[in-house]
């Protein structure tokens, strides 16, 4: 195998590894956002139960719900952005992996 082929394969492998790490990081951020959304949903149920049990808490429930809706829409927007970012990262990883396989194939053919 020639030096240039080894260099191309090494660079392509590094790019694939970097993109895999990026995809894992995006997945972690997405899981965190999904957890925040689940926590928000659980919190609103707790507040609704508290409002049913306590008249004073019931009067404050509407203000809480307004804030909750805002926080929920923010998290949902973050999730939408993360989904788009994840799709882009997957596409980039697919392309980088295809390039790596092309270089490996050319190197194998040049060895024969």
Language model features with spans:
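Charge-rich amphipathic alpha-helical interaction elements
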Residues: 1-112
